[in-house]
């Protein structure tokens, strides 16, 4: 993963307090949820160009240690991973479980991601969210 994709780590005094990954679809498409997501891309109707395997990558997971939340680490991680993938992809995509309200709020607010689809896998509902990698 590290050699062919992207990993950003946040450290405080040599302790890892957060991380985020992003990767090409070839790494993820072996899992059923990603196959479902990718199969839905051609049918998406949203305000941007068609999202494809070649103009987008999978973003996430992202994690920030609970005691460091609310200190700008989430935003810094998103900003840095966005900067790193921008030369390769126009969009980052992620999915968030409908019942994960904190993650949805962080991604729609702080990460400026937009809901582009809603889907169900194994009786669980998810938002598919997208963000441009460049302003």
What are these regions (language model features)?
Residues 5-9, 19, 56, 61, ...:
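Short hydrophobic/aromatic beta-strand element in the GNAT-like acyltransferase core
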Residues 61-64, 70-83, 109:
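Conserved acetyl-CoA-binding loop-helix of GNAT-fold acetyltransferases
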Residues 21-61:
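Conserved acyl-donor/pantetheine-binding loop and adjacent beta-alpha core of acyl/acetyltransferases
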